[in-house]
Design a protein with these regions (language model features):
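Conserved catalytic alpha/beta core of Sir2/sirtuin-type deacylases, generalized to analogous enzyme cores
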Residues: 1-300
Length: 300
């Protein structure tokens, strides 16, 4: 791997000379921005829940089988508040906008914290594939209306009692079928892909197609292997198959490159890069350094 400064300068040149930039963002970007799901931030906001349920972080606690809707929404209201509704724009996302705002860019993200919108990215250039904490939906997906949840979240937090339950009358129920509601997050086949979702999906896919033969830079931030089929695997394929494309991957621990061979994905760590198809490493820039430090250097 080239030196840090060499990679930064190469990336600087690619940003300046590329016709299009596609940003792919996963949880690692928000973690780098300070929206951590564990550690002191988790302990600060969820001390009572940790004491009652032995929670260890916000990711695993999201799968906890609460015994009642009153308990479930006491937790989720605080989770949604801390990570979206009452979480302002972060500096790192703002710097990322500074880096690309004068370019023809598009964002695809699996994050549900709305940081791209809060930080001033053009909403018409963002596709949030997995939903948003800022809305709730019918858990049975009986209809495709989504509901803003900010006022509901604040009232739940205000009225959560010592047993970490909200009043029964606050529990949201679907206005159509009368069943329970859930945060608007992709968890199963009940996730609602409404008209707006499909508009954003089409806009992203059209952007990719229109850029196919142009010089295009893929910037992938903090994407792991929870849902690699959305960003990571396609980015590797685009970079390998589209002649004028380049990929910069920012990841503290996963810089592997994936190659689809007869329908099966094979991962190649950097130390095995010599086994990759010829030319791949000429268009692949891996970074395991601090994301904000890299962006700061690019903005100099």
């Amino acid at each position: 791997m080239e030196s840090f400064n060499e990679r930064v300068e190469k990336l600087r040149n690619l940003i300046e000379t590329s016709d299009h930039i596609i940003i792919g963002a996963g949880a690692g970007l928000s973690t780098a921005a300070g929206i951590e799901y564990g550690g002191e931030r988790f302990k600060k906001h969820f001390a009572d829940f940790i004491k009652k349920y032995d929670f260890t972080d916000m990711y695993t606690s999201g799968f906890y089988p609460f015994k009642s809707e009153e308990e479930k929404w006491a937790y989720w209201a605080l989770h949604i508040s801390v990570n979206n509704v009452d979480m302002p724009a972060t500096g790192l996302y703002g710097k990322l906008l500074d880096l690309v705002e004068d370019k023809d860019y598009f964002v695809i993200t699996t994050n549900v914290d709305d940081q791209f919108f809060k930080s001033g990215f053009d909403p018409d250039r963002v596709f949030a594939t997995q939903g948003t904490y800022a809305k709730i939906q019918c858990a049975n997906a009986c209809h495709d209306t989504l509901y803003d949840d900010a006022d509901f979240v604040h009232e739940c937090i205000e009225k959560t009692d010592a047993d970490l339950k909200i009043p029964s009358e606050l529990v949201p129920v679907c206005p159509v079928c009368g069943r329970e509601m859930m945060p608007y997050l992709r968890a199963d086949d009940k996730f609602i892909e409404d008209e707006y979702w499909h508009e954003r999906s089409d806009a992203y896919n059209n952007f990719v197609l229109d850029a196919k033969y142009d010089k295009t830079l893929l910037l992938e931030f903090g994407v792991g292997f929870n849902t690699p089929i959305i960003i990571r695997l396609p980015f590797d394929a685009y970079n390998m198959n589209f002649k004028n494309w380049n990929l910069a991957r920012f990841n503290r621990s996963h810089l592997e490159y994936s190659v689809n061979i007869e329908g099966r994905y094979h991962l190649y760590p950097l130390e095995a890069s010599s086994r990759l198809p010829e030319g791949i490493m000429d268009s692949y820039l891996p970074f395991d350094e601090d994301m904000e430090c890299i962006i700061d250097k690019l903005l100099e």
